């Protein structure tokens, strides 16, 4: 019977698949065909091995925009590009895998953090169908950006189970981000490829150009996404330099240096300020041991920002971005590029409240706040347009309940992360927790003036970091309950140890 089934079912299917593959070698498949193939290609392994899906989602979203642009060599710009759905299909598979784990009672947890994440995800989904002022399809399109990757929290919280696995994912992501940094420098020094130029000619993406000059975007969807990636890459480099290991410092310094040129030339000044704040937060603030010192530092920072904002005697900014990008792409000397990008470009930061872009954002924020008075539960997914702030976009679309939920998630993540840093005996794990808390802190700053949880890599790293912190905290609590204190009175250490060294794809750093 098995032989009959093999001869009359399996062999014909293999022949048919071979014929289809041969046909497609000579005929370029459509976007929809390509999308379906790659979704199935990545989805099936993800359902069987959810951890593999985690690696996919630290890679695919970074390079799919580059792959999409290659199609412009053979076809016109489509009204709807199905290739955008490839990584979303993998995320959907990961959600199904998590649901199956819960159904089988293997990874179920009554953790409050997980409940908050689930409630936030469900609220985002409900606002697609209920209380929305747009159609379901348009609402689903908004949910794709706002809500789908929220569940990546559970990748860090439940799918990965050991500290060593988490560090391997970090190593994989650092290599992926380094590749995008190098490609960004290629665009700066040698310009854009033919397919990228065709893509640029077909779009009206206003923020991609400044005075008609295109900013580098590497493999990402936009210069802002490139800046997010380089900001995270720099922080990973700083973490590796602080970590123990004979080879980590050099590799950390390499990727930190590689992140700087694309970050500067992309000219997203919010990322510059957020990175500086993140460096101080990681290297100084999270290493202070006394609470009153931390409160004093925070108070001084708030006072400084208030004085900075109220200062009115500063000169206005001249437009220098055009010269900056031309200097980068025409290969001018380093001093000229530094003068343009660092000295002149930062002149606008002296009095940002008088900048046109800031005034426009303030007008948008006022409109959302006024609208929220009449729609306290939000107007539904994809109804606010670009709000220039993730927090106000949440307020405008899912209302005050959604904003309170998100702020609760953010506060709990930062609080639990600091508890892990303070109470962990494992210095390597404490250092890793500092990195995760810093990533959350930096992206939270960026979300004040942008929506950095709508596109990779910001959304992927943010929710994954929260998930890892949740897992570390749960294990710390379980260990403390099992062994409340050692001989010295200190809480029990986490069961996850970091004695094996940081492992990267293809090589282990002891």
Per-region residue spans from a language model:
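Hydrophobic alpha-helical segments of polytopic membrane proteins
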Residues: 1-17, 36-44, 168-175, 234-318, ...
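Aromatic-anchored transmembrane helix interface
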Residues: 84-94, 115-125, 135-158, 177
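Alpha-helical transmembrane segments of multi-pass inner-membrane proteins
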Residues: 121-129, 167-199, 204-212, 218-288, ...
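TM-adjacent membrane-interface loops and short helices in multi-pass inner/ER membrane proteins
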Residues: 322-387, 391-394, 398-405
């Amino acid at each position: 019977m098995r032989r009959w089934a093999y001869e009359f079912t399996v062999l014909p299917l293999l022949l048919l698949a071979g014929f289809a593959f041969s046909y497609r070698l000579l005929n370029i498949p459509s976007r929809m065909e390509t999308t379906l193939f790659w979704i199935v290609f990545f989805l099936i392994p993800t359902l069987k091995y959810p951890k593999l899906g985690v690696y996919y989602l630290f890679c695919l979203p970074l390079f799919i925009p580059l792959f999409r642009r290659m199609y412009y060599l053979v076809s016109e710009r489509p009204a709807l590009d199905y290739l955008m759905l490839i990584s979303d299909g993998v995320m959907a598979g990961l959600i199904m895998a998590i649901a199956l784990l819960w159904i089988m009672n293997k990874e179920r947890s009554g953790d409050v953090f997980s409940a908050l994440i689930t409630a936030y995800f469900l609220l985002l989904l409900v606002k697609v169908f209920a209380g929305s002022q747009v159609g379901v399809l348009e609402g689903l399109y908004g949910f794709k950006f706002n809500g789908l990757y929220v569940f990546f929290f559970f990748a860090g919280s439940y799918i990965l189970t050991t500290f060593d696995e988490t560090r391997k994912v970090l190593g994989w992501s650092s290599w992926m981000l380094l590749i995008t940094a190098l490609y960004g420098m290629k665009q700066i020094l040698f310009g854009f490829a033919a397919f990228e130029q065709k893509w640029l000619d077909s779009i009206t993406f206003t923020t991609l150009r400044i005075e008609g000059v295109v900013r580098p975007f590497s493999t990402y969807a936009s210069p802002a996404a490139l800046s997010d990636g380089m900001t995270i890459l720099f922080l990973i480099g700083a973490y590796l330099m602080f970590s123990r290991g004979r080879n980590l410092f050099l590799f950390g310094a390499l990727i930190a240096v590689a992140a700087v040129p694309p970050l500067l030339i992309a000219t997203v000044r919010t990322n510059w300020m957020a990175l500086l704040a993140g460096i101080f937060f990681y290297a100084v603030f999270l290493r202070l041991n006394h609470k009153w010192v931390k409160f004093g530092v925070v108070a001084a920072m708030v006072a400084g920002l208030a004085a900075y904002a109220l200062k009115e005697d500063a000169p206005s900014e001249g437009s220098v971005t055009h010269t900056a990008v031309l200097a980068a792409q025409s290969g001018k000397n380093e001093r000229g590029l530094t003068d343009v990008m660092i000295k002149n470009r930062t002149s606008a930061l002296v009095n940002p409240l008088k900048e046109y872009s800031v005034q426009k954002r303030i007008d948008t924020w006022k409109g959302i706040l006024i609208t929220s008075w009449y729609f306290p539960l939000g107007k539904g997914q994809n109804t606010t347009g670009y709000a220039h702030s993730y927090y106000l976009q949440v307020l405008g679309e899912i209302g005050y309940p959604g904003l309170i939920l998100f702020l609760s998630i953010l506060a709990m993540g930062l609080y639990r992360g600091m508890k892990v840093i303070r109470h962990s005996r494992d210095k390597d794990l404490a250092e890793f927790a500092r990195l995760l808390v810093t990533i959350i802190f930096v992206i939270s700053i960026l979300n004040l003036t942008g929506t950095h949880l709508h596109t990779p890599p910001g959304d992927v790293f943010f929710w994954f970091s929260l998930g890892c912190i949740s897992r570390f905290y749960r294990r710390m609590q379980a260990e403390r309950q099992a062994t409340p204190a050692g001989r010295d009175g200190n809480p029990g250490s986490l069961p996850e140890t970091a004695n094996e060294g940081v492992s990267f794809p293809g090589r282990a750093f002891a």
